[in-house]
Regions:
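Beta-rich strand-turn-strand
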Residues: 111-127, 131-135
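Structural motif
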Residues: 45, 65, 104-105, 120-124, ...
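Soluble, non-transmembrane catalytic domains of enzymes that act on hydrophobic metabolites at membranes
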Residues: 42, 59-62, 198
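Hydrophobic, membrane-inserted alpha-helices
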Residues: 47-49, 127
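Membrane-proximal basic amphipathic "stem/tether" segments
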Residues: 1-40
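Conserved active-site beta-strand element of glycosyltransferases/polysaccharide synthases
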Residues: 143
């Protein structure tokens, strides 16, 4: 097969995958589709994937078991700095740098996180929303910020979440919708729906 045809087929494949990411709205179903079609290097069990964008090289991404990835997360598998250097010097001696991203068991990644190439996120870790992960994340930690730094522990967040869950009186995950939970533990704003102060 000639190079031009390979490039065209690759573009069609990429556009089809992107279409699927936009049309499959449920994170569980999206992860199952990615796993079924072997888009990533590996996807374990109980993976929840909500981003609408796939990494440029999805085969460089490995998601272990019980991983939840929120909307807007970008998994960056390469740096295009080489393009800038090649154009600057009118050469082709600089090669694009690629790196794997491996996300271990029991990891939650918050909304709009950017994970850079070559990063491993250790087991039992949480990445706070908006973080930019430039280095490996140690096991059992919570990281946040730009660049991401350790700001807490996984076990502390787990304990706080359990304590908050107990406020709902023994209801278990998945039994009720948000509106049902708000009847048990109401949330009050300082203004009503019409903008009037309470």
């Amino acid at each position: 097969m000639n190079t031009a045809l390979k490039i065209i087929l690759d573009k069609i494949r990429r556009y089809y995958r992107q279409y699927k990411m936009l049309t499959i709205r449920d994170g569980w179903k999206k992860a199952k589709w990615l796993k079924k079609h072997k888009i990533f290097h590996y996807i374990g069990e109980n993976v929840y994937y909500t981003p609408n964008i796939l990494p440029a090289e999805p085969f460089l991404v490995c998601l272990h078991n019980n991983v939840a990835i929120s909307a807007g997360v970008r998994l960056i598998t390469h740096s295009i700095a080489a393009n800038v250097f090649n154009h600057e010097e009118d050469t082709n001696k600089y090669i694009t740098d690629f790196g794997k991203i491996e996300i271990m068991d029991n990891v939650y990644i918050g909304a709009n996180v950017c994970v850079n190439p070559g990063v491993t996120i250790g087991p039992n870790a949480i990445v706070a929303a908006g973080a930019v992960v430039t280095k490996d994340v140690p096991a059992g930690t919570v990281v946040g910020g730009v660049p991401a730094k350790v700001i807490g522990s996984y076990d502390n967040v787990k304990e706080k979440t359990l304590n908050k869950s107990k406020q709902y009186g023994g209801v278990t995950s998945g039994q009720l919708f948000v509106k049902d939970l708000l009847k048990i533990k109401p949330i009050n704003f300082s203004i009503d729906e019409d903008g009037e102060k309470k």
